Amino acid sequence: MAQQQSEIRYLTPPSVDVKKKKYCRFKKSGIKYIDYKDPEFLKKFLNEQGKILPRRITGTSLKFQRRIAQAVKRARHLALLPFVTDMMK
């Protein structure tokens, strides 16, 4: 049997996006401690439902993502941040 090599043809050529490299804002600005008593700062790392945004979206390093998660959990426990909400921002 003859093998046919299938060729994929696109209507528009696939484009390769040059994405800007994400950086950890904590390392860049030299922040060592994430304060759990500052809910306005922590809201930058939460979505509208109050869930913690993942690293792939925020660009933070693993070390600081863990610290953010711990600070958010502490703030929730002290009722500085809600556990769940419909529209937070």
From Swiss-Prot:
One of its GO terms (biological process) is translation. Binds as a heterodimer with protein bS6 to the central domain of the 16S rRNA, where it helps stabilize the platform of the 30S subunit. It comes from the Bacteria. GO terms for cellular component: cytosolic small ribosomal subunit. This is Small ribosomal subunit protein bS18. Keywords: Ribonucleoprotein, Ribosomal protein, RNA-binding, rRNA-binding. Part of the 30S ribosomal subunit. Forms a tight heterodimer with protein bS6. GO terms for molecular function: small ribosomal subunit rRNA binding; structural constituent of ribosome. Belongs to the bacterial ribosomal protein bS18 family. InterPro entries: Ribosomal_bS18, Ribosomal_bS18_CS, Ribosomal_bS18_sf. Transmembrane segments: none annotated.
